[in-house]
């Protein structure tokens, strides 16, 4: 306010005008603040309701909200300055008008004084003439100038109508103020009172952007001209009249140097005209790509992900928000759910829809899926589709009830494949988290009730139309009648406690709350013991959970603990009915407690008066009457609960048996494939080994043969050398001492010599 009060002091702004402008600014600031607060609260509540929120994602979203907050603050400041600067020049002229009027009043007062002094001067003049002794002449009194005032104008002695100073001021200042307000005054020096500093900065930025476009336009034109210079030279060589061809090229070169000149001067009926005009066409459309780029930059960016299978299954785009994904999931799940047993195809579709929502309905899993595709969800533990649909159905009423605590805990329990010991060790941390979450949950429900009941409080006759539409959409889901009956009963008696004769309803609420606490403690113990017996270990979890990475090891036949999938049909049905019944009862007690606290917050608001609180109580009672049409009473509640429990258990058992059969078939097919692959590998390896051994043996044999040949040659050479020496010695002996030799010996010696020669 101090900042904007400077306008009042600087431009001498009238008090009424300043108060009017400041009122508009206050209203604008309040509206912006309320809108911003509502959006931020809604955003943070959506984050808080998520099971997991990555720290980096939270930081990024927080920074984006801070940027949006600052942008809205700047916009409001800009709008307020616009309001304050809207007619500053008119106030200047009004002040000028006042000063001119003040001067005109002074001038008129001075003129009246002068006119009053004129008769005195004339009398003194006549007296002087009389005293001078001259002839006494009768001097008739001179009449005053015949000036008549005609409203704002004067008429002189000649009959001309002259504008007064006041009329001139009015024409120059008052009319200017009126024309400025109407927006028709065209004085270039003093008009445009709405042109502020922000407008000047905007125009400078716009001019800068236009200069950048002009620069890019010139560069594109020069590139086009360079591309077409070859064509121009080609045309110059082949035209009949070279002089006429050269003229357009010169004009075109001049046009490239000075692109501000229009292209009309280049157009001449020459042969090269077609080639010269092509750059001008590109020049005319230079601005179009810039506008397309600008439009694409302003549009929402499309996420590029490696795998879109789950998005295709749900029939949503990759940019779909959680509300759209949830709505699409329930629509598809409700179509497939009743027909699971009709064939494997329907169950397969129902299973895939649940898998898709288990991934895309969770922020962390969705982020990993968007980043890595199928590889990012290999370790995700998927629940039995019917169990997941049961928990999702209990969460479907979250606008009226919030997400039940048992649903949050069981999802955490199943998805993390925790044992009961792990759950007990983390119980303290979980309880603290659930207590804080419960407060936020009750505040959300109370806010939602206020939003849907506000039209009824305001007296709108059609306030119930959106509520009926909402309840019609919830109709048909699992355990819808028990949930609506609990909400109806709580809303009815809470509303009565704030109206006349409230003691009876207050007593009923107290008795029901105490009974719920006692039953809730027993049911919690029974559920924990049952889960610990049949789902206490990760091996026992295999009957209702699975993942893609260890899908072949999900069935553990060697486990000696009790497994639901190993029980008989009767025992399996009995155990599952107990578990489902316990889960539903705990959810209903939790829903009643949450609805009770939220309704009390709504009807005990200290920021409103008693009359408004009474209207809220009456509206809440009307809401309970509408819910009664869909609930059908306590007797119908028990029947519907029993029927839905048996129905859900039947589909859970069907899902367990179907998934286990698929896994067993896969496990049985593995050894056959392994044996077949082993035999094929053995044959292939044998062939490769034979070839490899043959090659190695051949090489080794060749090397060995070469070595043997070399050794034999050396030995033969040595033997031959030795034999020659022996022969020489024998010859010497023969010469010295003649020896007698038989013919047989001679024949043997010759034969041996020939044999040795042949071997060598």
From Swiss-Prot:
| Cystine pairings recorded for this chain | none
Q: Where is the composition biased (Basic and acidic residues)?
A: 231-242, 262-288, 683-692
Tell me where in or outside the cell this protein is found. Answer: Cell membrane
Where the record annotates domain J, the positions are 307-375
Q: How does it sit in the membrane?
A: Peripheral membrane protein
Region ranges (Disordered): 214-300, 683-738
Checking InterPro entries in the record gives:
DnaJ_domain (IPR001623), DnaJ_domain_CS (IPR018253), DnaJ_X (IPR026894), EMIR (IPR052423), J_dom_sf (IPR036869), PRESA_N (IPR019111), PRESA_N_sf (IPR044885)
Which Gene Ontology terms of cellular component type are present? plasma membrane
Keywords of the record: Cell membrane, Glycoprotein, Malaria, Membrane
Q: What glycosylation sites does the entry record?
A: 425, 559, 563
Q: Per the annotation, which location comes first and is thus the protein's main one?
A: membrane
Q: Where is the composition biased (Acidic residues)?
A: 216-230, 243-256, 693-720
Q: Which PANTHER family match?
A: DNAJ HEAT SHOCK N-TERMINAL DOMAIN-CONTAINING PROTEIN, DNAJ HEAT SHOCK N-TERMINAL DOMAIN-CONTAINING PROTEIN-RELATED
General function of this protein:
May disrupt the normal intermolecular interactions of the cytoplasmic domain of band 3 and thereby facilitate the invagination of the red cell membrane which is necessary for the formation of the parasitophorous vacuole.
Instruction: Please state what the protein is called.
Output: Ring-infected erythrocyte surface antigen
Give the species. Answer: Plasmodium falciparum (isolate NF7 / Ghana)
């Amino acid at each position: 306010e101090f900042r904007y009060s400077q306008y009042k002091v600087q431009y001498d702004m009238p008090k009424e005008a300043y108060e009017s402008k400041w009122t508009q600014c206050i209203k604008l600031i309040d509206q912006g603040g309320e809108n911003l607060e509502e959006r931020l609260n809604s955003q943070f509540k959506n984050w808080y309701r998520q099971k997991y929120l990555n720290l980096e994602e939270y930081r990024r979203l927080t920074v984006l909200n801070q940027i949006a907050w600052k942008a809205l603050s700047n916009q409001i400041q800009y709008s307020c300055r616009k309001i304050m600067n809207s007619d500053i020049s008119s106030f200047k002229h009004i002040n000028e008008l006042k000063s001119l009027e003040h001067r005109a009043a002074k001038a008129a007062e001075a003129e009246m004084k002068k006119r009053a002094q004129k008769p005195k001067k004339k009398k003194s003049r006549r007296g002087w003439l009389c005293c001078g002794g001259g002839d006494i002449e009768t001097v008739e009194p001179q009449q005053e100038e015949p000036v008549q005032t005609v409203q704002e104008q004067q008429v002189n002695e000649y009959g001309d109508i002259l504008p007064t100073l006041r009329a001139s001021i009015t024409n120059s200042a008052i009319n200017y103020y009126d024309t400025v307000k109407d927006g028709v005054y065209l004085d270039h020096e003093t008009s445009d009172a709405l042109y502020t500093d922000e407008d000047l900065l905007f125009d400078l930025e716009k001019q800068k952007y236009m200069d950048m476009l002009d620069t890019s336009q010139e560069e594109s034109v020069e590139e086009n001209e360079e591309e077409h210079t070859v064509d121009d030279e080609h045309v110059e060589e082949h035209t009949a009249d070279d002089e006429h061809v050269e003229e357009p090229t010169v004009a075109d070169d001049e046009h490239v140097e000075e692109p501000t000149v229009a292209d009309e001067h280049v157009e001449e009926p020459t042969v090269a005209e077609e080639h010269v005009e092509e750059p001008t066409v590109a020049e005319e459309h230079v601005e179009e790509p810039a506008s397309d780029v600008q439009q694409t930059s302003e549009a929402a960016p499309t996420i590029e992900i490696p795998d879109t299978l789950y998005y295709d299954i749900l029939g949503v785009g990759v940019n779909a928000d959680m509300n759209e994904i949830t709505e699409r999931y329930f629509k598809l799940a409700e179509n497939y759910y009743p027909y699971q047993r009709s064939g494997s195809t329907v169950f397969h579709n129902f299973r895939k829809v649940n898998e898709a929502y288990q991934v895309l309905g969770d922020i962390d899993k969705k982020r990993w899926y968007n980043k890595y595709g199928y590889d990012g969800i290999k370790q995700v533990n998927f629940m039995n589709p019917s169990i997941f649909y049961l928990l999702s159905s209990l969460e479907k009423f979250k606008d009226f009830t919030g997400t039940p605590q048992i649903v949050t805990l069981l999802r955490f329990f199943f998805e993390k494949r925790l044992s009961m010991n792990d759950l007990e060790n983390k119980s303290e941390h979980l309880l603290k988290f659930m207590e804080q979450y419960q407060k936020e949950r009750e505040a959300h429900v109370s806010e939602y009730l206020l939003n849907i009941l506000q039209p009824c409080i305001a007296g709108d006759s059609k306030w119930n139309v959106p509520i009926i539409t909402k309840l019609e959409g919830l109709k048909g889901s699992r355990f819808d009648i028990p949930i609506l009956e609990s909400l109806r009963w709580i809303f009815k008696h809470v509303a009565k406690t704030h109206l006349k004769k409230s003691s009876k309803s207050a007593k009923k609420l107290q008795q029901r709350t105490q009974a719920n606490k006692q039953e809730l403690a027993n049911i919690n113990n029974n559920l924990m013991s049952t889960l610990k017996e049949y789902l206490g270990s990760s091996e026992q979890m295999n009957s209702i959970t699975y993942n893609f990475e260890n899908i072949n090891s999900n069935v553990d036949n060697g486990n000696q603990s009790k497994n639901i999938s190993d029980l008989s049909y009767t025992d399996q049905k009995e155990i599952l009915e107990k578990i489902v019944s316990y889960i539903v009862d705990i959810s209903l007690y939790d829903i009643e407690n949450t609805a009770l606290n939220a309704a009390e917050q709504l009807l005990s608001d200290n920021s409103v008066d008693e009359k408004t609180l009474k209207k809220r109580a009456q509206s809440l009672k009307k809401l309970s009457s509408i819910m009664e049409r869909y609930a059908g009473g306590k007797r119908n509640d028990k029947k519907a609960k029993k029927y839905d429990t048996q129905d859900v258990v039947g589909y859970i058992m069907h899902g367990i048996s179907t998934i286990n059969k698929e896994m067993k078939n896969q496990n049985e097919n593995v050894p056959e494939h392994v044996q077949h692959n082993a035999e094929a590998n053995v044959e292939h390896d044998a062939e490769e080994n034979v070839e490899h051994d043959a090659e190695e043996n051949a090489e080794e044999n060749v090397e060995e043969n070469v070595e043997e040949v070399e050794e034999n040659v050396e030995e033969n050479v040595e033997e031959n050398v030795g034999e020659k020496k022996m022969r020489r010695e024998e010859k010497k002996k023969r010469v010295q001492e003649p020896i007698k030799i038989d013919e047989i010996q001679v024949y043997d010696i010759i034969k041996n010599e020939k044999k040795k020669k042949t071997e060598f």
